[in-house]
Amino acid sequence: MVETIFPGIRVRRVTTPRLTANVLEREADAAADAVRTVVFVHGNVSSSLFWQPMMLDLPGDMRAIAVDLRGFGDSEPLPVDASRGVRDFSDDVASVIHELDLGAVHLVGWSMGGGVVMQLLLDRPELVASLTLQSTVSPFGFGGTAVDGSLLAPDAAGTGGGGANPDFVARLASGDRSDEPGSPRAVYRSSYVAPGFVSEHEDVWVESMLSTRTGVDNYPGDATTSDSWPGFAPGTRGVLNTMAPTVFDTSGIVGVEPKPPLLWIHGSQDAIVGDASFFDLNQLGKAAIIPGWPGDEVAPPQQMLVQTRAVLDRYAAAGGAVTELELENCGHSPHLEKPAEFRTALLELLGA
């Protein structure tokens, strides 16, 4: 059996009016008089476990907390209402912040978690002291949009729950710990980190991935049929549908006042979030992996980085302080792959 909790980390159950959440914190923080609190929010097919090395590496005058989103880790596997975008997740995180009486916190969101913390900034700006977006989903969701964020098809065909690989979902559900092609371990090695990166904690990261609850109410969610290529559109339930561009748009952070300082950190070899992501159905079509692709004029791959940079440029033009850091030889997980650079950038943002 894999020991998933690192020495110096303790597990806490936090019951709010919305859910019972699983929370990780540093043992030393229990009695500490923290000047700042950092709240880490994981991404899709992961959990708070991934944040442990960075939590332990933060200075002692900070409080470090990582929250499991519903349906991940050991938080309640409550259904996800995707008609609200990621608000089920962001409202859950806000409820934990409120229950722990943390006040304004420094939010760090990874991948889908970046979308969650952007949504939290939109809905509860008083809770956000700063915002760190690591390998974040675009402010216009995942897939199905032109560069300006407009929908390529009215129903956002090719996005949402129908885009998941059924074999991968089945392997998650069965607890597959092998390194076979398509297994969670293989996906971690090929997509979560850059080629050649090796972690002594890989078994823990695989356990984290395997904590993902599967099904139409959780991961990946449901789907509907579409007359547009590739024949499906988002449903209204489950994780992948929360990031469908029909329901997800956090570009409104440009109008938030006051604007907290913002850090966007990402790897140059990110296989999941990029301008030619092979997790984007349109990119798979362009590469002839999915047949029948109607072409760039109808279904171009999403320019995720271009979109994010454009929104953050507007955020800066409207008075916000924005720092972008792209790390070379780094994939989707800078906090694991380039921890020193990540830590330095985060502490600079926090003024520590």
Where are these regions (language model features)?
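Catalytic histidine-centered segment of alpha/beta-hydrolase-like enzymes
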Residues: 291-299, 330-339
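Conserved HGGG/HGGXW glycine-rich cap/lid loop of the alpha/beta-hydrolase fold
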Residues: 22-82
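Conserved hydrolase catalytic core segment
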Residues: 57, 61, 103-149
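Alpha/beta-hydrolase fold catalytic core
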Residues: 1-38, 60-62, 102-103, 159-161, ...
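Hydrophobic beta-strand anchors of alpha/beta hydrolase catalytic cores
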Residues: 38-40, 64, 108, 262, ...
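Glycine-rich His-Gly loop
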Residues: 28, 40-43, 111, 136, ...
